[in-house]
Amino acid sequence: MDHIYTLGIDIGSTASKCVMLADGKEIVAKSLISVGAGTSGPQRAISEVLEQAGKTKDEMAFVLATGYGRNSLEEIADAQMSELSCHAKGATFLFPQVHTVVDIGGQDVKILQVENGVMTNFVMNDKCAAGTGRFLDVMARVLEVKVQDLGMLGAQSTKQVEISSTCTVFAESEVISQLSMGTDKRDIINGIHRSVAS
């Protein structure tokens, strides 16, 4: 049976993501490159996905670009869509009962309300680096943990620690101060999460 292959590319400010679907249902290949718009990241992400799947660009029935740098792929993409709409559709694809999506990007944080794969409302924080992916990258580096482990570690917190600064530089100083006082990293991480959410 012949499959219909499609490619989705999300070009963010700090990362490039690509995914290939078969028949709009099955994830065939995916890639995440830690550099985004204006770099080789988007092309590398596409190349990785095509290589993983053993396919060529010409075998793709449709290519969609989204994200901060979506306009940079006009020659490759058949269409462009806002990342908000893509988040709603993608989250519903993975988790059909989803109602809330939180996107912590390199430049901003977006919280979406989703109903049946459609975004019905959203709020966004785009002031400096407060609460963004870059903020969390810096905090993870200072704490010497992987950014992907922050959620699990923060959930193990047993004591409330306040990180009051929303500025990345000042929050980094607060975290270093907490570490020097012997505060448990898990409690600091929980404080960071609460700071991002406020």
Task: Label each region the model flagged.
Residues 173-198:
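Adenine-nucleotide phosphate-binding core of ATP-dependent small-molecule kinases
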Residues 3-44, 48, 126:
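Short glycine-rich, Thr/Ser-proximal phosphate-binding strand/loop in the N-terminal lobe
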Residues 32-35, 53-85, 113, 120-121:
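Short beta-strand-loop/turn "lid" adjacent to the catalytic site in phosphate-handling enzymes
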Residues 10-14, 68, 104-108:
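A short acidic Gly-Thr/Ser loop motif
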Residues 146-178:
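Internal, active-site/partner-interface "lid" segment
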Residues 38, 116-159:
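Glycine-rich phosphate-binding loop plus the immediately following alpha-helix
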